């Protein structure tokens, strides 16, 4: 629903004047009265970017929960920065020395909050690591998650939205968006246990399969995990009449990354410690071994086209890190930068409430007028607009027909 809300706002906000000129704009008022449920509220702002004039407003300063339209403010603020094109980085470093096929030192994986870091990228990073002349690590393997604070959810996020994948446990070390894709295929005979497979493959989680094929008495299909105790036993139960594919989040993302990283190093023949830890990369005496970079445009496209909450929060964290230059940044550090742009566009930040970067929080309150002013600003800045425009969702043909009618 939030994805479609963002899509609808962009469709209305960016329509050219020629489209609106075909209809009597004054009829929108009667349409609002006729279509909206009694006692409901709406705010509308329609602006012609080419002619630089407002075409229609209706309570455009009214505050409402923006849902995923909040992503516009986060994306535009991020793109407005002079360092906007810097990629998202995940790095591997080591200290100590390499002697006789052994690393006499520690390995560090430094997270840069890359929300697109997936299984193939993990393999690529490991392939770089194993080019170094050692097969034994006589030290520790650490994850460095010091980029942000330890809060894994945004302010105002609902605790019982977990284990939905749209609310992942955030960390500077994200792996496959902190989620597992579960594919379920019914068996050939009624009553058979369905086939269940998971991606990415990792021993970090376990699986319990209590499904039955074409068996309504088995109950409604369900995918969950023991999330109240932060467990990662994926539990698949109930009737499976047809093929299905679902996502479920995993607790917690940094540990999911590091566990899988060690597991795959072992699979490549590297002798590693039994466990991992978390600490900061030393300020000196360390050498970089490997690095993966994800372009900002890729992160932005997923953010806007798919209304990806994780990508929006990664952008917010990145804004905070770039603006402050410090470690352990908070969401508030990023929100301060968004509010600076709000003020620069002629609005009073005290008139609005921003709690996160993606709009998942129920504490956010924005207005149509503010959203349109952000779009106007983006349009006026060619560097910002070109990147933002590429990332916007494309109107499907059947929706175009609906608008034309």
Predicted features and spans:
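A general secondary-structure junction signal
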Residues: 46-48, 94-96, 143-147, 280, ...
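Short active-site loop at a secondary-structure junction
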Residues: 57-77, 81
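Conserved serine DD-peptidase/penicillin-binding transpeptidase domain
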Residues: 30, 81-349
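Beta-lactamase-like hydrolase cores
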Residues: 21-62, 88, 123, 127-132
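Bacterial Sec-dependent N-terminal signal peptides
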Residues: 1-27
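Small-residue-rich helix-loop
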Residues: 34, 55-57, 306, 316-405
């Amino acid at each position: 629903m939030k994805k479609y809300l963002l899509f609808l706002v962009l469709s209305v906000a960016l329509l050219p004047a020629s489209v609106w000129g075909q209809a009597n704009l004054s009829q929108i008022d009667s349409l609002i009265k006729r279509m909206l449920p009694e006692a409901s509220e709406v705010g509308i702002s329609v602006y012609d970017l080419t002619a630089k004039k407002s075409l229609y407003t209706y309570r455009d300063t009214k505050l409402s929960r923006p849902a995923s339209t909040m992503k516009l403010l986060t994306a535009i603020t991020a793109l407005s920065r002079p360092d906007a094109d810097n990629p998202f980085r995940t790095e591997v470093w080591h200290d100590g020395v390499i002697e006789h096929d052994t690393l006499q030192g520690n390995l560090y994986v430094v997270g840069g909050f890359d929300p697109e870091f997936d299984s193939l990228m993990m393999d690529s990073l490991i392939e770089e690591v194993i080019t170094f002349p050692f097969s034994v690590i006589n030290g520790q393997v650490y994850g460095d998650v010091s980029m942000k604070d330890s809060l894994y959810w945004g302010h105002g996020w609902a605790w019982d939205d977990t284990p939905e994948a749209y609310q992942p446990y955030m960390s500077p070390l994200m792996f496959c968006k902190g989620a597992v894709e579960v594919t379920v295929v019914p068996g050939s005979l009624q009553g058979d246990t369905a086939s269940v497979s998971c991606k990415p493959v990792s021993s970090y989680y376990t699986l319990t399969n209590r499904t039955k094929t074409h068996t309504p008495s088995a109950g409604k299909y369900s995918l969950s995990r023991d999330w109240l105790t932060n467990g990662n036993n994926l539990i698949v139960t109930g009737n499976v009449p047809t093929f299905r594919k679902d996502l479920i989040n995993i607790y917690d993302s940094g540990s999911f990354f590091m566990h899988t990283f060690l597991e795959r190093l072992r699979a490549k023949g590297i002798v590693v410690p039994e466990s991992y830890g978390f600490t900061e990369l030393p300020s000196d005496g360390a050498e970089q071994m490997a690095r993966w970079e994800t372009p900002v445009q890729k992160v932005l496209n997923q953010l806007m086209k798919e209304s990806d909450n994780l990508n929006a929060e990664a952008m917010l964290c990145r804004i905070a890190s770039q603006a402050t230059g410090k470690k352990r940044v908070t969401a508030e550090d990023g929100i301060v930068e968004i509010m600076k742009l709000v003020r620069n566009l002629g609005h009073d930040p005290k008139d609005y409430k921003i709690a996160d970067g993606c709009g998942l929080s129920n504490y956010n309150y924005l207005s149509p007028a503010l959203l349109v002013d952000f779009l106007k600003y983006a349009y006026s800045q060619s560097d910002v607009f070109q990147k933002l425009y590429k990332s916007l969702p494309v109107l499907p043909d059947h929706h175009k027909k609906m608008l034309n009618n």
